[in-house]
Amino acid sequence: MAAALTRPPPGTVQCFGRKKTAVAVSYCKPGRGLIKVNGVPIELIRPEMLRLKAFEPILLAGRSRFKDIDMRIRVRGGGKTSQIYAIRQAIAKALVAYYQKYVDEASKKEVKDIFARYDRTLLVADPRRCEPKKFGGRGARARFQKSYR
């Protein structure tokens, strides 16, 4: 219990990203540009299409903004695609929070505007969830066929 309440060390920022049931928590601190997901470098994510999706915030903001910081991301829950979307949101939110706390407000606003213009879900979670199945049919909305004779 005490470990859960400890504050992160000075110079770090902790942010999370969510998509459906996937949750990614990113720890951002001064460093030399390393980004690791569950202990593995982000460059090794497979398949290729999902890796490109995870790289979006890095490519949008520019590698130069990431060269002085290290990010460690832990992701759990959901499927592969949901995890990637949670990771990209965690990266984007952590960069914005880091710039707000340790750099300056102007560059934070610039980065935030770049992300918001490209895709709002980089900064804001998608509220859609799976609708539960109901009786009288095979799914949430589909009904069994009705017969009058």
Curated annotation (Swiss-Prot):
Named from the GO MF annotations, one term is: structural constituent of ribosome
Q: Return the InterPro entries for the record.
A: Ribosomal_Su5_D2-typ_SF, Ribosomal_uS9, Ribosomal_uS9_CS, Ribsml_uS5_D2-typ_fold_subgr
Q: Which Gene3D superfamilies match?
A: 3.30.230.10
What processes in GO biological process is this protein linked to? maturation of SSU-rRNA from tricistronic rRNA transcript (SSU-rRNA, 5.8S rRNA, LSU-rRNA); translation
- SUPFAM superfamilies per record: Ribosomal protein S5 domain 2-like
Q: Which PROSITE patterns match?
A: RIBOSOMAL_S9
Respond yes or no to whether keyword Transmembrane is given for this record: no
Q: What would be one Pfam family of this protein?
A: Ribosomal_S9
- Which locations, inside or outside the cell, does it occupy? Cytoplasm
Q: Name one GO cellular component term.
A: cytosolic small ribosomal subunit
Keywords (A to Z) from UniProt: Cytoplasm, Ribonucleoprotein, Ribosomal protein
Write down the PANTHER family for this protein, in alphabetical order. Answer: RIBOSOMAL PROTEIN S16, RIBOSOMAL PROTEIN S9
What's this protein's family per the entry? Belongs to the universal ribosomal protein uS9 family.
This chain belongs to the protein called Small ribosomal subunit protein uS9
Organism annotation: Oryza sativa subsp. indica (Rice)
